Amino acid sequence: MRTGRIAALMLSTVVALLGIGGCASSVLDVGYHPATAPNPPLRAVAQARRVVIRPVVDRRLDDTRIGPASKNGEAMVSRRPVVDIVRDALAAELTRAGYSMVAEGGDVVLAPEVEEFWIDVVSGYKTTLYVGRVVIALAVVDAASGERVLVRRYVAISRREGDENPKRAARDALEVALARALHDLATDPTIPAAFGSRSDPPARS
């Protein structure tokens, strides 16, 4: 009986270890670090200073990870939800440009979507290349009429080499790609133009 119990205990331990190994992941603490101060195009326009940002829609093909599995089977995942990272980055840029983020009653509404937030790993002869790619789609909606006045898409790529600290290289590649995508948004003159084209709310009787 004792031998049978020991065998059963050993078997359950092996199964548990296999389960842990199958769920192993490499967690990256990805954040947003603006590369430069916002350029004039995104400066707040007088007609629309209050902005509502809708929850970011995740359109990624695989929303469970941000990079491929490594040789040891660890998939790259983000410590924070990707939609939260993108929303916070967008809010940070708009706030720096002089806009006020509000939960409701805004002059304009932004409807963001994240299409890609991914790290590719390219193993070379002497070094490993980490390629971060971020794609964000953004719709500007007139709060008064509910009409979409602008739809834009921002694509950014960043490359980093890293063998001594692959985790940091992967994180840096993705953070720089995110910063570039937001920089493109911040310097896009069509955004404040769309904000300024909003309709006046209907007068109350």
Predicted regions and their residues:
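Short secondary-structure boundary motifs at beta->alpha junctions and helix caps
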Residues: 65-81, 144-195
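Sec-dependent bacterial lipoprotein signal peptides
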Residues: 1-23
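Surface-exposed short loop/turn segments
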Residues: 24-32, 97-149, 159-164
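Mid-chain, structured segments of secreted extracytoplasmic proteins
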Residues: 76-100
